[in-house]
């Protein structure tokens, strides 16, 4: 055990599109289900099956908190159309939930979905177009399994002319700032 309570990333892994047939589900979900860590991300990577990923997290008892919105963010975009039950509006509120979970000895992680800042958010139709084009290329090129995520992300950067990479950089910075504030509040509780 490393004792890391807050972990920041761009987007968590999850169930790939078609996971009902090929069972391609990221180990991120298994870890969140059993490891006492709070992950701050811009949601789930947009290339994944968001509803299925959220269902798996619910099944594993992982609280999903959205920061400042009642809609689950979709990585490059601020919204996915998926409504969530638990909205948090301050780092202190997140820290209080983490502390309550810890004090009550509930094992497993917490996912804090923090939308990309509006000025860096991409157009949802453009993102969907890039993802669908990348998925078609992957199928044509025979890419699957552990190679699919890096292939898709690289291809999406090419298709978007680098806009997705810039969005990714900005959302990680945004998540790091929120994660630091949550950690500070948690240390003071």
Positions of PLM-derived features:
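Solvent-exposed alpha-helices and their adjacent loops that cap or buttress functional pockets
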Residues: 1, 6-8, 24, 29-34, ...
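General beta-strand structural signal in soluble alpha/beta enzymes
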Residues: 6-11, 17, 39-41, 64-68, ...
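Short, well-ordered, mixed-charge alpha-helical segments that flank or form enzyme active sites
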Residues: 8-9, 14-19, 46-49, 73-76
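Glycine-rich beta-alpha junction loops
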Residues: 13, 68-73, 113-120
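Active-site glycine-rich loop that binds ribose-phosphate moieties when present
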Residues: 20-58, 91-96
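Glycine-rich, Lys/Arg-enriched anion-binding loops that position phosphate/diphosphate groups
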Residues: 49-80
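Anionic-ligand binding region
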Residues: 76-103
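A C-terminal functional module that forms or caps the active site or interfaces directly
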Residues: 108-171
